[in-house]
């Protein structure tokens, strides 16, 4: 399905019925990363999975844009209010920003290996990003994709190739699409001031999910969320890196469904 939002054609998938749950993908992925969640969640919820602008099958016009405004536009177009937001990495950062700007539209938050705007924990671990930065500097998109797959899918403390097929091919295909998008021609506007110093304003019940093999910067961000968001709870998925919903879908589904279905 497609809809025009703020001058861009945005692709999304929708299934099930009930209270709406919007899944926001990571920056190395697209809506397909949530495929292992669709059957379990759509039995009880209206499941919406957009490809964000420049990812998957959504276009990226060469104009300024705002991820928060795109999400708001999608929710308005689909008449969704309020919703549960589930976001991974970049999608988690968007969920946080959206919850700060539009608290009345968010019922519950699930933040998976989440980013938070205004943090820079990654700069503390430059050695982990050396291979990625070298491939990026060389302009070798295939090498960059492979390096990012090891960093984000395998995780920095597990051997290269630890995560098996078909997840490796899925990662490479999802990430390749965004690597070929020209984000330099479409500058994005972000929350100002950023979320890092405003996390105490979040009022939605919040579940912070991390894989124990994720990057240390992601662990630092999870610690910040736990310290700053009132009542936040943490769930650690063992033997999982940055995309725990793909590595251990049954455990992830159980944890998140239990949280969303609380009364």
Where does each model-flagged region fall?
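Acidic beta-to-alpha connecting loop that harbors the catalytic carboxylate
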Residues: 17, 212-214, 239-241
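Structural signature of beta-strand start/N-cap positions in the alpha/beta core
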Residues: 20, 44-46, 81-84, 105-108, ...
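Active-site loop/oxyanion-hole signature of alpha/beta-hydrolase fold enzymes
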Residues: 35-42, 48-90, 254-257
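Conserved alpha/beta-hydrolase catalytic His-Asp/Glu region
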Residues: 123-124, 138-193, 198
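Conserved HGGG/HGGXW glycine-rich cap/lid loop of the alpha/beta-hydrolase fold
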Residues: 6-60
């Amino acid at each position: 399905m497609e809809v025009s939002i703020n001058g861009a054609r945005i692709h999304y998938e929708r299934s099930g019925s009930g209270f709406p749950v919007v899944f926001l993908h990571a920056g190395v992925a697209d809506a397909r990363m949530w495929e292992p969640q669709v059957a379990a969640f759509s039995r009880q919820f209206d499941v919406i999975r957009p490809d964000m602008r420049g990812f998957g099958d959504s276009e990226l016009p060469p104009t300024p844009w705002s991820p928060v405004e795109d999400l708001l536009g999608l929710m308005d177009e689909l008449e969704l209010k309020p919703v549960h937001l589930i976001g991974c990495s970049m999608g988690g950062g968007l969920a946080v920003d959206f919850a700060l700007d539009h608290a009345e539209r968010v019922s519950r938050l699930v933040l998976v290996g989440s980013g938070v705007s205004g943090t820079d924990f990654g700069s503390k671990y430059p050695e982990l990003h050396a291979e990625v930065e070298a491939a990026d500097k060389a302009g070798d998109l295939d090498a960059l994709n492979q390096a990012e797959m090891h960093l984000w899918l395998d995780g920095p403390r597990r051997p290269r190739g630890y995560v098996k097929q078909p997840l490796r091919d899925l990662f490479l295909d999802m990430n390749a699409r965004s690597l070929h998008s020209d984000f330099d021609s479409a500058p994005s506007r972000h929350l100002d001031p950023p979320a890092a110093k405003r996390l105490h304003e979040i009022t939605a019940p919040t579940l912070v999910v991390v894989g124990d093999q994720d990057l240390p910067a992601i662990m630092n961000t999870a610690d910040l969320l736990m310290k700053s968001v009132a009542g936040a709870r943490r769930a650690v998925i063992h033997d999982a890196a940055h995309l725990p919903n793909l590595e251990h879908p049954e455990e992830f589904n159980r944890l998140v469904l239990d949280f969303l279905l609380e009364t």
